[in-house]
């Protein structure tokens, strides 16, 4: 399959990488913690990645919860656009909190799904299983071009050829 030169996702244009691209998102910590750990020699791999790759600090979206922030990164848009406004929502019909980890709440495609639709191979790994379905929305796992799993449930994961 011939890959296109760029992908458009949610009104933003992303160039198709010429070689394998990996994005690592470290969430929930002050960037200075990482700087200190690197300076003290505690994170040599992160130090190497910063020196040889690209390192960016993103500003948090409000509310400052994992799900809205991860989906803002994955879609390139704020919660008002992608629809994941918190980790939970209150369902007035049932009177219960509902975890916002279901694709039905997602109102914008992820950048990953747009690259997949353009013919790229996509692998998505997340620490928390609650994010796996949202981050892998739009990927098809029966075509041999997409893999998604969580570290939390890695013991239940297998890939068959």
Q: What spans do the regions from the language model cover?
A:
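A residue-level signal for conserved active-site and pocket-lining positions in enzyme catalytic cores
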Residues: 27, 73, 115
